[in-house]
Amino acid sequence: MQGKNTIVTTGDYSIGLLSQTSGNLNTDTIIRVNSDGSVTPSFSDGDDTFIVTAGNHAVGVLACASPGSARACVSSLDEESTTDTGSNENNAIAKLDMAKGEITTHGTESYAAYANGTVVKAGDTLDYTNASVTLTDVDITTHGDNAHAIAARQGTVSFNQGEIYTTGPDAATAKIYNGGTVTLKNTSAVAHQGSGIGLESSINGQEATVDILSGSSLRSANEILYHKNETSNVTITDSEVSSAADVFINNIKGHLTVDATNSKITGSANISTDVNTHTYLSLSDNSTWDIKADSTVSNLTVDNSTVYISRADGRDVEPTRLTITENYVGNNGVLHLRTELGDDNSATDKVVINGNTSGTTRAKVTNAGGSGAY
């Protein structure tokens, strides 16, 4: 499909573009729009594709691969199914590649890009590529409750070089449910009334992977990372993330690992009291974390990076506490704290480590007022 195209749908559960495999036919389905099939497709002036949906539960572009007998391709991301057990006998691939264009959705739970598949298990490896969507130089706007820009359920979505705006309540930049992979590269994203990335699951044994790469910027009204999944891995490289709520991580349940490299992170880290819930955060290569409020992580590694417990911004000190429930590792790390020089009851930032510490870390303490105890 080449050239300038316009696709408009007006009904509930409608689809702009669909790549689908199902049943016993082990045959791949691949749709390409203005793409030459390469990793970096070439574009021609005017070769834009515009997709607009107006209806609830609609999808702009959808790759669907055997989502289960109790689920349809356009079933909502978190619609439950007793058949969604995490295995697939059909290895056929549904793939949709779109280069250069715009996707706009209007309606409740109307996603711009949706990869809806069933994981293929190979030993201990989980493969979520049987349903995949790749968007390059595409801009996304969604209007509606829970109208996530990117949705993946045991599928893979890659977004490269574009802008994302979600305007409706609880509409995230991206959400993964019951496992999957999302990659954001050269992406500017704003979730005006939702979270940045939502990672959730209703079944055990599934993994969620998110890569935020190459100068991407994510801003959200609520937390950047909402986590309620068994196992998730998030990589942030050469990028910035922040939220209007000043919350970076909200880990309700499960094991969440976040690796930030040469990136700027703003917002607190929250974790539930569930003993099986853990947050492992690693900062490297000149990354900064401005925690903004009391924060808790399980493990923290600060490698040639900086953590601002609070900043010397001229305001009165509001004591902030960073709690590390397990271990801390420093490699030329820096921790910035503020304290009032007074008696034992003076306001001060704190770092509390319940486990072991290792490596080298410098603490930079700024006087927030006072001249010492007498």
Locate predicted features:
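Extracellular beta-solenoid/beta-roll
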Residues: 207, 217-221, 227-362, 366-367, ...
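Beta-strand-rich solenoid/repeat architectures in extracellular/passenger domains
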Residues: 1-13, 29-57, 79-111, 130-146, ...
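Right-handed parallel beta-helix/beta-solenoid
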Residues: 9-10, 18-32, 62-95, 114-132, ...
